[in-house]
Each structure stands twice: as structure tokens, then as C-alpha cells.
Amino acid sequence: MASPPAHRSSKAADEELPKASSTFHPSLWGSFFLTYQPPTAPQRANMKERAEVLRERVRKVLKGSTTDQLPETVNLILTLQRLGLGYYYENEIDKLLHQIYSNSDYNVKDLNLVSQRFYLLRKNGYDVPSDVFLSFKTEEGGFACAAADTRSLLSLYNAAYLWKHGEEVLDEAISSTRLRLQDLLGRLLPESPFAKEVSSSLRTPLFRRVGILEARNYIPIYETEATRNEAVLELAKLNFNLQQLDFCEELKHCSAWWNEMIAKSKLTFVRDRIVEEYFWMNGACYDPPYSLSRIILTKITGLITIIDDMFDTHGTTEDCMKFAEAFGRWDESAIHLLPEYMKDFYILMLETFQSFEDALGPEKSYRVLYLKQAMERLVELYTKEIKWRDEDYVATMSEHLQVSAESIGANALTCSAYAGMGDMSITKETFEWALSFPQFIRTFGSFVRLSNDVVSTKREQTKDHSPSTVHCYMKEHGITMDDACEKIKELIEDSWKDMLEQSLALKGLPKVVPQLVFDFSRTTDNMYRDRDALTSSEALKEMIQLLFVEPIPE
């Protein structure tokens, strides 16, 4: 290895804070969510009462559905899930899914039905074969679908993205239908609901969309459909607006916590992104019962952001090593190990973890021990990356991912979400499984790492950073940065296939475990698809406005 380059001296670390970097723009939201309430707040009690009535009305519709009317039943389940209502009907939907899976007596020549059935079952954990699409292939390599049957074309395109390795028929379906949908889009009225659906799918296939954002965007489209169910539509609007009220209360709480953290710790150099971090984590745990998960996740993400900025940008190597030594002690007595500017943050971090235990109560406070273990491992890996940086060491891609797929925080995030869940199916065994960093979680971690690196490498190459996976791939294969980024995008695509295959093979775990990992993947894809939206958060402003500021008109 090369000898370590000269780094910033920590001589004055106890006397002054690290200087703020001009890289990070200030918060776009300031104190907005400390005081904001959506205009629907005064009607909350009436909204809840009406929503309860509608939920039971829709439940009757769902209970009246049978596989004898398969197209209608499949479409109803898909609609409820897209509108963000699936959570309320898990038992009814699970029963119907089993019947749909077991019933092979359906019209296998109906491309729309075949596509929707395949999509629905694979999305919900059924390993159905893809050869159901072979009969639709033409001699020219395309798929038989009448030019006017645009709905079937779109359904096939979205279904094909639930693909596994080696499923050539789905590879071909994607390439064939994408071209036809792109051509179709040019002939549709841009503002028509179907044009919006096609455009959304070409940008992000249905399976990869963030659930709560999809609900917000799909409700106005569903409202225009001739076959809409009025009770379902009204419930979807009320449900979203009620969730928005909860989200704003949680944002107020998290914003107040963050402001106190920064004011007392005086760490003004870190990225001020608590609203964006809540938005990101909300995308993984948006269902109504997961309020505590959203709060824990947001605070953990805030803590990780501070630690990451200390290690990656502002702290000296010596200071970061001192922090790592103190971190695992989880005790105020360890502050003597720290430079002055880290001491207040360390105390506030301990108080935050204690607040998690208090919120969980005696029966579930044990979960915080697992969360602490995940965070200890994260900081340990940060120190390894600092050593690589100081030694100018560029690992191979495989060696890098052995560390960085975990140091991206995959375990800390999954354990944070599981910790806050009221679901008693989350047990000690669930946490022990997650902390063992099984292949499914490792693949998710690699996905997050690669997604982050491919959009942040060019920005970070001008600073004193550890080499990214992009740099590792460039050196290992002797190619340009642009070529390496294209290859990494292929690896990201492969990660979706890997995660699907691995999730279908999982046994003995609560259903929420793989669901959560996919929801994390979706919200991460939304954050990093075209840009690093956490660091440069202007791209998120409109989405945040839609989710947390603007109610859906009734």
C-alpha cells in the first residue's frame, strides 16, 4: 500500500469547530413544519368517522369478490394496493391471492389478465412462472397485442419488471413494449390520464414506485376512470388526507428534535435535511400503524448524516477514531475520549436512544439493543473506509462492496423500522437474522450503495473522499468514469432481480420483512435515480409539497 497522504491536523480540534463546507445548500424548509397544519386539520374527527364507514363498505365489496370473476377481482386488489388502502384488507386480500394462485382456470389468451395476474402474484410473494407469456410471442420477436389494446401493453410492460435472472421472455417483453409505449406516448394527449400512466411507467415501472407517492398520484387518475368505485375513491382521498395530518405531526416532532440537536451540539457544518430524510424514510414505512418506525428511522437517518459528515468531510482521522472508540460504550463517561466539538452530540445521541426505549416500553425496549449493535457496526466500518482513504487504497469492486454494502446503513435502517413496529411477529429472531447480514439484506445494501455512488461520485471526486465503487470499477477494469457508471447502472438493475429471487426464497419470516426491504429500495431509487436528492434536495420539493402540504380535494 502507498504511504498515507498528509491530512488535516487535529491540533486545534478542542478549540474550534470544523469549518462549514459550502457544498451543502441550506434547508429549503427551515422551520416550516414546526407550525404548519394542513387545512383539513379541523375536520379530522369527521374525516375519521366517515373513513371507518367507507372501509367497511369497501370490505363488503372485497368479500363479495371471487375468482369466478377473475379480471374484476384482480383489478380490485391492484387498485386498492395502488391507492394505499391494501393495509386495511390484508386478511381478505391474502385469502383471495391464495385462491387466484390456486385457480388455473382462467382465460390464458387475455394478455391484460395474464399480465395483471402475474404482476399481482409475484409482487405479493408468489413464485409464479413467466412461461405464461410465451404464447403471446410472435415470430418476429415481439408480443401479440392489438394496436388498440394499449391497456394490455402497459400491463405487460409493468409485469415484466418482476423478472428474475434468465427469464428471457420478460427481457424481450420489456424491450419490445417499451418501444411501442414510447411511440404510443407521442400520439396521446399529454394531459390525458392514460398518457400520464404510460409516462410514469416508462420513467419508473409500477413495481418500483414509492407506495405513498403512487397513491397520491394515482387517486386523481382513478377519479377519471369510468369503472371507478365511488366508495373506494372517497375512502382513498380521506385516507390520504388523514395520513397527511399524521405525517405533519411526525414532521413537527422530528424537526423540533433536529433543531435542538444542531443548536445544542453546534454542529452547524452538517447537511440540514431532516424534512428530506423524513420524506425518504416515510416512503419505506407509510402505512398508518408505523408512526414510531417513521420517527425512529428519521432520527437514525439524521444521526447517520451527522456521523457521515464528520467522518467523510469535516472530522480529522484522529477525531473520528476517538469517536469510534467512544461510540460503542454508550455511556456519558466516554466523553473524555472525544474532542470538544463532538461531546454535546454524543450526549444528545445517548438521550435519543433512551427516548426510543421509553417509547417502546418494557416489552419491546430490547429492540434498541439490536439497533445499537447495527449502529456500532456502521461506525466500525466507517473507520475501515477512513483507513482506505488515508492509505490511498483503491479496493477491488468485490472487496469494496464487502464493506460498503454494509456501511451504507442497510442494517441500521431495517433494524430501525422493525424496532418501531407494533407487529408482535417481529421478534428477537427477526433482528438476529437481519444483523447476520443475510444475502437478501446484503443485496439491498449493495443496491443502495451503487445507487448512491453512481450519482454522487463526480461531486465527491473533488474532495478528500474514500474511493467509491465507481472509482474501484474504473481502476479494476481500466475504463472511464462514464463507462464505469453505465456498468454500475447494469449492476443496479441486476440487484432488483437478485432481491426478487431472494425474497421469493425466504422462509419463516414475517411477511413485512421482505415488503419493507422492497419499500426501502423503492424510496432509495426515488432519491438517487437521477441525482443525489438528499444532498441537492431541490428535486424533492414538489414531491414533499404533494405529500405533506397539499391535501387531495374531496
UniProtKB/Swiss-Prot annotation:
Coarse class of the protein's main subcellular location: cytoplasm
Any one of the GO CC terms: cytoplasm
UniProt keyword list: Cytoplasm, Magnesium, Manganese, Metal-binding
CDD domains: Terpene_cyclase_plant_C1
Extra information: The allele found in cv. B73 encodes an inactive enzyme while the two alleles found in cv. Delprim encode an active (TPS5A) and an inactive (TPS5B) enzyme.
PANTHER family in alphabetical order: INACTIVE SESQUITHUJENE SYNTHASE, OS04G0344100 PROTEIN-RELATED
The name this protein goes by in its record: Inactive sesquithujene synthase B
